[in-house]
Amino acid sequence: KKGKKNMASSLMHYAITDKILQLFPMHDGARLRFGAVLPDASVNKRKTHFRVYSEKLGIRLYDLEAYRAQFGKRMQKDDLYLGYYLHLIEDALYRKTLYDTFGWNPYTPESTARMHHDYTLLNRHFIQKYNIRDDLAVPENFTQEPIFAFEPFDAEGLLRSIHQNFVPAPADAPY
């Protein structure tokens, strides 16, 4: 699965955002949730995740300052843009934990395949444990949003992919 080998699953972003909304109600929770999964709705993940290469460190980093420079004012007024920013922070923390704390190597096919299998198992667990609803929707007039001009996201495709997590597993599935 090209482009998803080192990020938390979209459903995990949804679950985290749902929990945040329970603790800190926002003006528009639906837009916050949608924004929190939006960076994964593109094949150009480096661009949508504001990833830049650091010569000094020899790795790609999340350029949160670039996101704030481009969308910071909107982020203060529009929960979609705040949700998008939350996604970037979650991914940065996830990578730091996975790589630095646990020493995970994303460059082997075995570890990537194992992680995607784990996502499948965890996604179903999160749906049940946190009572996650299959209610994400593309906001009205989304294609008119400045963020859509930044990258023409395949939001409908992402929602179809997330929806697949809610389809019951076959009876013979191990989990």
Residue ranges of predicted features:
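N-terminal leader/auxiliary helical segments
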Residues: 2-175
